[in-house]
Amino acid sequence: MTPNAALRNADSVKKALLGLSTAEIAGILPDAPAYTAKQIRAFCFAGKEIPDMTSVSAERRTALREAGYVANPVTVERVYASRDGSKKYLFRMRDGNLVEGVFMPHDYGASLCVSTQVGCRMGCAFCASGKDGLVRNLDFSEILGQVVAVNASEGGTVKNRAVVNVVLMGSGEPLDNYDNVARFLAEVSAADGLNISERNISLSTSGLVDGIRRLADSGSKVTLSISLHSPFDEERKKIMPVAKKYSVAELTDAAKYYFTVTGRRVIFEYTLIKGVNDSDACAKRLHELTRGFPCHINLIRLNEVKGSGLERPRADAADAFLKKLLDMGVSATLRRSFGEDIAGACGQLRRRVIDEETAAERAAAKSGADGRNAKTTVEKGGASKPAKHTDRSKFTTV
């Protein structure tokens, strides 16, 4: 049987090679030598597409392409470069959907924030990701594809990675897409993959208590970041609908369980919102909740989202709140905001580009004009142009 014939008869629904095991790849090319599957897997993690896998026979590369396979199901649509050195990546999925990532350089190694869902069902008042609700979960290969694409784009290799740390804090709730996130964690940390230790990975959750306990029981060693944002149940319910299901007490109990099982210190994310959660009473309650528990509070000033009605506190007010915590002996820091000049907060860039593309579609429909086709370039403080015209009939705007 020829490679083409074998592929035509294969169950190839996913059509993405990235993250498949050598056994899974071998099943796609059953007549290939055993080493071919290992080569293909290595090429995928190196950010190579099928035509660039030159040590694989031309016949098999053609067979893969004709069967509709790609190495990475994610393409870089645009790149925005910020004055602070960070970069906002806009990724397009094969079905046309968009998600975001942020590349953040640090002295201790660059971090990449990736998305786990298109949109989000959590509906947090201060987050642009959930304004349109959940569109769909990302497949594990699409989460992995963001890391591989940026690592290659930033000049990294498998052995000398540009991406040192990964943060699951982009669009979506990771624990609402648990199975795909678990497979992603296994693949991104695999010795024959990117080999990023789970200790270099942070997972941020809005507070799905059952998911936190499941993650702890899985043997995970990732750093757990919990979006707290208010120490009071009634106030938290106003800005985070998930609080209607899980109380602050249940959430802190789950955090303590995660620490007990994994030995990993838990981070509480706390977005400072003017007049909402920056009072003396909030600081005192945070001290009470975290007393005697190895954890850390990560403060960040709100990135304002249009239409939310929520305001960002002044820098001196944020500093004062931090001082209150420190004076009470609470482990806390005020985190730097990355990419403020390039819509760096969750969902802001995706929302803006969807609006731009929708407006362009309407204009094109009105004038009968075709979409434009341009090469992707990086522009400081601004956007690159789309790499290609995409069939927007498959693009979900919700």
Task: Identify the role of each PLM range.
Residues 1-97, 256-265, 272-398:
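Auxiliary Fe-S-binding modules of radical SAM enzymes
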Residues 81-82, 115-116, 129, 204, ...:
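Short linear Ser/Thr-Pro motifs
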Residues 85, 110, 162:
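Exposed loop/turn and edge beta-strand positions of beta-sandwich/beta-sheet ligand-binding modules
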Residues 98-103:
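A short loop-to-beta-strand scaffold at the N-terminal edge of the catalytic core in hydrolase folds
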Residues 105-149:
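Canonical Radical SAM [4Fe-4S] cluster-binding loop centered on the CxxxCxxC motif
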Residues 138, 207, 337-341:
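Short beta->alpha linker loops
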Residues 151-330:
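Conserved AdoMet/S-adenosylmethionine-binding subsite of the radical SAM
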